[in-house]
Design a protein with these regions (language model features):
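Class I S-adenosyl-L-methionine
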Residues: 25-34, 38-67, 74-77, 83-182
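Short, flexible coil/linker segments at or flanking structured domains
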Residues: 2-3, 7, 11, 57, ...
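SAM-dependent nucleic-acid methyltransferase catalytic core
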Residues: 1-33
Length: 182
């Protein structure tokens, strides 16, 4: 892989490179708020039922065909680097990883039914009770909303903004995995 490269966009820095190479070089941040790959994959049979084959792209009828990017969860070395890089952390899919005990989980109630999970859990090291947000979301499309991306695990902007609000007024926020299309 090429050496990491930094691009400045307004007051934000975008690093192009493997997070395992970049994270150790960055100063500690106030908060990591991230949605890393957690190895859930996508049910390829759902996409096949619509007759579509698109190699990791949105398929007809709102289905999605995986292309291998989420077949395996991130490793413990990723988790260790994330936790060492920040004061506070919000990690979606935290129930798929080995993380320290936490009294505060963020719960996103998607208000849906069907093939997708009713809720998503984000592990935190925040010192507060469990928090829940209701935000209707069904796969790649939010019913009645404007946000449409085609990313199979995209988080609504409002949900991610809410996660940031749960942290203790972070000045610097890091997402080492480029989020989930939000």
């Amino acid at each position: 892989m090429n050496a990491p490269m930094k691009i400045v966009i307004g007051n934000a820095e975008l690093w192009l490179g493997d997070c395992m190479d970049v994270l150790p070089t960055l100063p500690k941040v106030d908060a990591v708020i991230t949605d890393p790959p957690y190895g859930i994959g996508i049910d390829r049979s759902m996409a096949k039922s619509s007759g579509a084959q698109s190699g990791g792209m949105a398929a007809p009828k709102g289905r999605y065909i995986a292309s291998g990017w989420d077949d395996e969860p991130i490793g413990q070395e990723h988790i260790d680097l994330i936790l060492a890089s920040c004061k506070e952390a919000v990690i979606f899919g935290g129930n798929y990883f080995v993380l320290p005990p936490s009294k505060c989980w963020l719960v996103w109630d998607k208000k849906v039914n069907g093939h997708f999970a009713d809720c998503e859990l984000a592990w935190t090291n925040l010192d507060k009770p469990v928090r829940r947000i209701e935000w209707m979301w069904n796969g790649m499309l939010r019913k009645g909303g404007e946000e449409r991306n085609g990313h199979p695990t995209q988080k609504p902007l409002g949900v991610m903004a809410w996660c940031i609000e749960q942290a203790s007024n972070p000045k610097t926020i890091l997402d080492p995995f480029m989020g989930s299309g939000t």
